[in-house]
Amino acid sequence: MDKKFARIRRATRARRKLQELGATRLVVHRTPRHIYAQVIAPNGSEVLVAASTVEKAIAEQLKYTGNKDAAAAVGKAVAERALEKGIKDVSFDRSGFQYHGRVQALADAAREAGLQF
């Protein structure tokens, strides 16, 4: 089992549990160059809010899009957009990634901006 397959198995297990709860999810995906965050409806088929370092508005403020500062900017942006739509409570879906570094920075920034999880 390689590293990517193990991560996908962890993510699948966590998503199954969150689906049983029927919770709105804050999903994080990261690549070496970018980080993406989406708030997904409980049914799992609708993206309610999204933000990423690919967006010009966020990328222009940053020197580099693949670090913790960039992740914090995405976390703040996704939280502000979610609060505008009336979404306050979410479950954090880290997609099998360790809760460390950029994933943690995004989560902390989203909490500081007002999301609860």
Curated annotation (Swiss-Prot):
The keyword Zinc does not apply. It comes from Shigella sonnei (strain Ss046). PANTHER family: 39S RIBOSOMAL PROTEIN L18, MITOCHONDRIAL (PTHR12899), LARGE RIBOSOMAL SUBUNIT PROTEIN UL18M (PTHR12899:SF3). Belongs to the universal ribosomal protein uL18 family. This is Large ribosomal subunit protein uL18. One of its GO terms (cellular component) is cytosolic large ribosomal subunit. One of its GO terms (biological process) is translation. The lineage of its organism: Bacteria, Pseudomonadati, Pseudomonadota, Gammaproteobacteria, Enterobacterales. The keyword Lipid metabolism does not apply.
